[in-house]
Structure formats: C-alpha cells, structure tokens
C-alpha cells in the first residue's frame, strides 16, 4: 500500500478517542467565510499527490484557510509524545455541503512556534501516558495560523454511516482492519483507502470518522 498504514491508524485512533466527547456537545454552526459545498466523499489529489478535500489541500492550505472554510470556533492542543510534539485541534461545529459535524485536524509541525506556545501555556499531565499536553488559549492560536494542515477528520453528527454506505461512497476498501486492544476487539473498524488517502472508521456505537491524509 502506498499510504503509511501505521501513520493513518495512529492519527485516526487519537482523533477518534478524543472525539467521543464532541458528540454530546450542543451544535451551533458558526458564520463561515468560505463554506465548502463538497460532500465528505468528494476528494482528489493534487499534482504533488496531496489530499484535496473541502476546497483545501493538505500540506499547503493553512489553519487560517481552514478557519475560513469551517468557522472560527476552533480549539488547539499541543501534545508531547514519544515521537515528538504535535499540535491537534478541532472545530466544534461546522457544515460541509448539507452535512453538519465536527472537524478535527493536525498541523504540520513547526518546532519554533511549538516551543513558544509551550513557554506561554500551562501544561497538563496525561493520566495514562504521563505525557504533557497544553490546551492553547485563543491568543496563542495566532502562532499557528500560517501553519499547513497535515490531516483532517470529519465527524458527522446527524447521520449514521453503515459499511454499505462507506463502500457505496468510497468504493471497495483496500483493507478492513478491526481495532484490537489487549487482543480483544473494540468494535471499531477501519476501512482503508491508501491510494485515496482515506480512512473511514465506524464504531459499535454507530459513530463514524472520515480521516483524510496525503497518501
């Protein structure tokens, strides 16, 4: 497969677990400057093989471009991990085409901006991993407005996707992976489309995430 399976599943799992809290939050779609009319299954690749979705091009379009597309109700968190620091965020509510949901994302790493943010933000200790995280206040978001978006993950909140829906919109997946923890199935299934840069995740609670990353 041309897509790094480990990368897309790792990012998807982080966003998927973290996103569960978003489903219970009240929805209020903010004013959007440049709303995308593309449904979540319409994607393409640029000449450089970067994912194009919702009018954005990953690794090129910036956080500011994403704000213009998805609205300004955005939150950023900086995570310290074994593989290095990572800035992740989400739009609590947005609309793409006729669909309403949350939009999670990661940014291309910029060590200088991340170091500045860590100096000014208050760290929190992750209970399980022991790693530090920094929930960035709105005034620190400006540090990252020009940073390119690395990945996106759309979390629809008003529709239920089935395996047949996934295959009908994206085609037959190259691989289907059942997520396991401690050798036990979690009920979460990944439908991988490496040539498209797409990972569709369905869980046993009928929740779904469509993740987009450049192949």
Feature roles, as predicted:
Residues 53-61:
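Short, contiguous acidic and Ser/Thr-rich linear segments
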Residues 21-23, 45-47, 153-159:
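Short low-complexity stretches enriched in small and charged residues
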Residues 26-47:
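Ser/Thr/Pro/Gly-rich low-complexity linker/stalk segments immediately outside membranes or between
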Residues 42-54, 142-151:
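Acidic/histidine-rich, surface-exposed loop or edge segments in extracytoplasmic proteins
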Residues 32-34, 61-215:
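A cross-family detector of function-defining hotspots
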Residues 1-6:
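Positively charged n-region of N-terminal signal peptides that target proteins for export
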Residues 9-27:
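Hydrophobic membrane-insertion alpha-helices, especially the h-region
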